[in-house]
Amino acid sequence: MEQYNVTGMSCAACSSRVEKAVSKVEGVTSCSVSLLTNSMGVEGSASPQDIISAAEEAGYGASLKGKDSSAKNASADEDMLTDKETPLLKKRLIASLGFLIVLMYFSMGHMMWGWPVPAVLEHNHVAMGLIQLLLSAAVMIINQKFFISGFKSLLHRAPNMDTLVALGSGASFVYSTYALFAMTNAQMNGDSAGVMSYMHEFYFESAAMILTLITVGKMLEARSKGKTTDALKGLMKLAPKTANVIRNGIEETVPIEQVRKGDIFAVRPGENIPVDGVVIEGSSAVNESALTGESIPVDKEKGYTVSAATVNQSGFIKCEATRVGEDTTLSQIIKMVSDAAATKAPIAKVADKVSGIFVPAVILIAAVTIIVWLLLGEGIGFALARGISVLVISCPCALGLATPVAIMVGNGVGAKNGILFKTAVSLEEAGKTQIVALDKTGTITVGEPKVTNIIPADGVSEEELLEEAYSLERKSEHPLAKAVLAEADKRGIKAHEVENFAALPGNGLSADLNGRKIFGGNMKFISSKVSIPDKIKTEAQKLAEEGKTPLFFISDNMLRGVIAVADVIKEDSPQAVRELQNMGIRVVMLTGDNEKTAAAIGKQAGVDEVIAGVLPDGKESVIRRLRSQGKTAMVGDGINDAPALTRADIGIAIGAGTDVAIDAADVVLMKSRLSDVPAAIRLSRAALRNIHENLFWAFIYNVIGIPLAAGVWIGLFGWKLNPMFGAAAMSLSSFCVVTNALRLNLFDIRDSRRDKKIKQNTVKGGEMMEKTIKVEGMMCPHCEASVKSALEEIPGVEQASASHEAGEAVVTLSADVSDETLKNAIEAKGYKVVG
């Protein structure tokens, strides 16, 4: 996706106009414009020049975002997000208020409350009118941006909010100017009644008040919108500007864009790490909270990776740069959050469609309002006031901002907590999850075996057993051996040199230690060497049932003991699973382990269903089957999880996983904590709830406000709206929507106390029976739909799914249905059942 900066947009109608114009360019497959970040994301083969030209022809400016260096890009993007609008609006507001206060004094203070005026103006109605004209003209000149933008958009046949303001204020001014000339003519003709009549037709104060109140609203809106991008700006500010690079043995400070892959750089305590790298010398504790939200420092030593923008807290380290420029973790996070802001959530489509026709519709309603009141016999002043009220109370911005502000704030909250949503779609859809499929290794479990139990034989201490096991296992490359080595290192146990080491495939290890023959391996192998006491056998079997692997060790034909090794579950996994279940989500664990081991891990984690013996290439088909039962999220971290992550409705990658898994996912968890999965879903639900609130108030505001402004209720209740109050309401509407979205910043994504179960149309694995049928002849999705509908018409079939790629159909049964019945239903549609 190519990113562009866009200038000149003032409301949702503007962004809609740019989007439509660019989407028409040949070669553009998708276009999404963000009013909040003044940016545009475009996909397709169209040239940048054609895209920029299309935006310019629509009346707006566009430029391609630079790609020269992450530091320059971060600085440029940060500059684009900097709130330059609020200071300018503040100056305009102060100047406008100065003239407006004087105008209100002359137009209302003197006329309504008899406030004193200079003697030369006393009873001089023409002079009073002329002063009001000049004062209101001054306010209009100060706020000329509304007129320039509004009428320019009108000429491009794409009216926007500025057009409504310009028409409303302009109409008030033009009619008042006409009334002033008419009053002057009446005074010259000695028509005192005409003078008094026209004097009450002045709307100069309305013209100025509309502009001033809209400016107030714009300033509040700009300030609030600026806060919605705080998280993104905060990430950009983290980008280091310089690095201490060592070249030819000399340390020098260079701009960050000059750092190249393979450069050696030094980082002292208190300094930010400039680029991603690997430690080659020294050790330290690094604060990674800027990227992961985790405040506890992480120990780093030789061979450990470090990331840009994290803080070296204690020791001096030297590192080799592995990722620089746009490839650093920080740059990727910034890009991910920025790209998400440039995308649109499905729920925004309705508001976008309305925004696209809203302004022309309002102009038409205002014109009809004026004509109807004139036909009903009301004066031009009354009719015009109703039409102007319609123009200035209508607010397309509230509709246009309802979704993007909530998406932006939600993405910011996620980023601050180490949860990255790649698109607005993923932020919206994650909260609708009904089934969560968890890969076992590295997701539920730590991902590397650890020693869990040490059971020494009689007369042997734990240290003695571990010492012999350490000496034997240190020459093995097996993952289980590494667990024994890590435990011995942790306890400070020293290994002894062994001789005649041999690895016996499928059995175990053997070696000579100080003249003694030692063996290590599984129960079957060791049982062939010595007799194992029943007590030890029983304990070993119990460990195996818990999903642990018991390793037996003997020396000189004497059992020395058992060391149990297992890939232990993460501390937060059971709690995370409970939270998901409390949210009404069914939790399924996928693993390639045997059923006994899988069941043990599943029981510890508390999942609803365990699917064991799943080969790496089989995860994708399992996810496809689960999707037929409900909206499914897949959580994984490895390369073999990528197809399943892509197939799932929502793919969630654990941050410590591979780049391939992260690329395939819709949501990335920077920390390796499973508890971030319910947190992400919780945040998604909160964001969606906020969007619904915003859309409701934006729609209801216009539904109530426009008829009130048009005078629909005058006959029934006598209600009518002064244009000035309409302008005030318009000013506050967008501000209220943005402020409501900012409430998401206060949302605690870890608080599970308010979780609500949502009604799910899922099928519990233990309550239903599932059958897989091999089918020949399916060639396309239409074939799949035919087979699916045929099966679901059979009584007792709760759900069915079919895949022409896999050549199979899967049915979930709530009652006993014979294979013959299923076969006949499929073959009646012209397909062949082969198994």
Sequence positions of predicted segments:
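Flexible metal-binding regulatory segments at protein termini and peripheral loops
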Residues: 1-129, 152, 250-251, 335-343, ...
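Membrane-embedded alpha-helical bundles of multi-pass transporters
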Residues: 112-126, 155, 174, 413, ...
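Conserved ATP-binding TGD loop and adjacent catalytic N/P-domain core of P-type ATPases
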Residues: 16, 29, 269, 433, ...
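ATP-driven catalytic headpiece of P-type ATPases
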Residues: 91, 310, 431-477, 507-588, ...
